Each structure stands twice: as C-alpha cells, then as structure tokens.
Amino acid sequence: MMHEKLKKAVGWAALEYVSSGMIIGVGTGSTTDHFIDALGTVKHKIEGVVSSSEQSTTKLKSMGILLFNLNDVDGLDIYVDGTDEINSNMQMIKGGGAALTREKVLAAAANKFICIADTSKQVDILGNFPLPIEVIPMAHAWVARELVHLTGGLPKYRQGVITDNGNIILDIYNLKILDAIALEKIINNIPGVVTVGLFANRCADIALISSDLGIEEISRSIK
C-alpha cells in the first residue's frame, strides 16, 4: 500500500511541469497511470497527448484526453514516463511493460524527458532488473545467441508477450552494466533487434523520485 502511495505522489508531482498549450508524451506503466489521472484534471488546458502504448491509450481515452498521432505533430514539449531502474547518470532500464520501442521514440521526440519513480528504482549499477529487448519473431533464437556472445548475460524469451508492434521480448539476466551507452549501441546493432530497453543515449533530463520524505527533483548535469 505504501509503495502505491509513493507511485501516486510522484505521478501527481509531474503535473507541475505541465503548462497550457503543451503536447505531452505519455509513457506506460503503473506510475504513469497516476500521471494520467492527474493529467485528466487539466485536460482542458493542454493541446493534447501522444501515447506510447495501447494500454495508455485506453486509459487516456477513458479520461477524455485528446490524443494525437506522433506523425501529426512536430514534436513533444515533455515526455513523462516511469522506469524499471535509474542510475545517477539518469540512464535507465525500461521495458518491463513491453512498450520500450514506442517509449524510446517519444523520449527522442521530446524537448524534455521527465522520469517519475519511487526510490526503489534508484540503483548504483544498472542490470539487476532484466534488460528487455524487442526482437522481430523470426530472429529471436539467433539474436539470443548473439546476446550471449556479446554481453555474457542470459537471455530469456518472455512467454506470452507480443508487443504493440507485433514483436517479442527477450529479457537479459545477469548483467552488470558499467557502460550503458556502449552496450545500447552494441545491442541495437544486432540485426533483428528493434531496440533495447537501455535509455542511455537519450536519458532523462529530470527525475522525480518519491520516498517517505517526499519528492526529490534531480536534474541531469550537462558535461
């Protein structure tokens, strides 16, 4: 119950970054669902939203929030989404909900990426959470062998999951990711991989982290 309260608190806290006339990218997941609830209270002020998944689209429609296709807008003012892990460099593992490809596209299209999470998602080193990879179905066995060779991790097929794009998910276990940018590039270069759930090249600009002490705002340092 306390964990759910932390998710709700940070979801609603992200509303402070919403301004009139914005086009907002909306992620996927239980924490993002709380942001959608909050967004419903200001739906008359914003231009509309672009959704990262059918799951979020269903909830947004139920709230009466205007939806756009990404192809019909020039870009996004902000993108708000949760995460499975986030490190001090604002790099993330995402994709537990199997929406990683569309999430990554929206993050890239946004002027500002706001990550919302509770403190349990903060880690020193990425990799304890299995790293999701979206793969075209005909290539998953070959891609899995390549992943063993290139990463040393253990890829497992996520049973019963088909992405909104019609693909499958491989989750890589037993990773200790010390160079997330390099690993993201290596995995994305494997033929058959649609994308990997490492958000390192396009990391978060702001992280809102909820704990028993309240909401902490962390901004990405520009090096």
Curated annotation (Swiss-Prot):
Substrate binds at T28, G29, S30, T31, D81, G82, T83, D84, K94, G95, G96, G97, K121. The keyword Isomerase applies. It holds the Pfam family Rib_5-P_isom_A. SUPFAM superfamilies: D-ribose-5-phosphate isomerase (RpiA), lid domain (SSF75445), NagB/RpiA/CoA transferase-like (SSF100950). One of its GO terms (molecular function) is ribose-5-phosphate isomerase activity. GO terms for cellular component: cytosol. Pathway: Carbohydrate degradation; pentose phosphate pathway; D-ribose 5-phosphate from D-ribulose 5-phosphate (non-oxidative stage): step 1/1. Transmembrane segments: none annotated. InterPro entries: NagB/RpiA_transferase-like, Ribose5P_isomerase_typA_subgr, Ribose5P_isomerase_type_A. It comes from the Bacteria. It is an enzyme of class 5 (isomerase). The keyword Isomerase applies. The active site is at E103. Keywords: Isomerase. It catalyses: aldehydo-D-ribose 5-phosphate = D-ribulose 5-phosphate. GO terms for biological process: D-ribose metabolic process; pentose-phosphate shunt, non-oxidative branch. Its EC number is 5.3.1.6. Homodimer. Belongs to the ribose 5-phosphate isomerase family. NCBIfam families: PRK00702.1, rpiA. Catalyzes the reversible conversion of ribose-5-phosphate to ribulose 5-phosphate. This is Ribose-5-phosphate isomerase A. It comes from Baumannia cicadellinicola subsp. Homalodisca coagulata. The gene is rpiA.
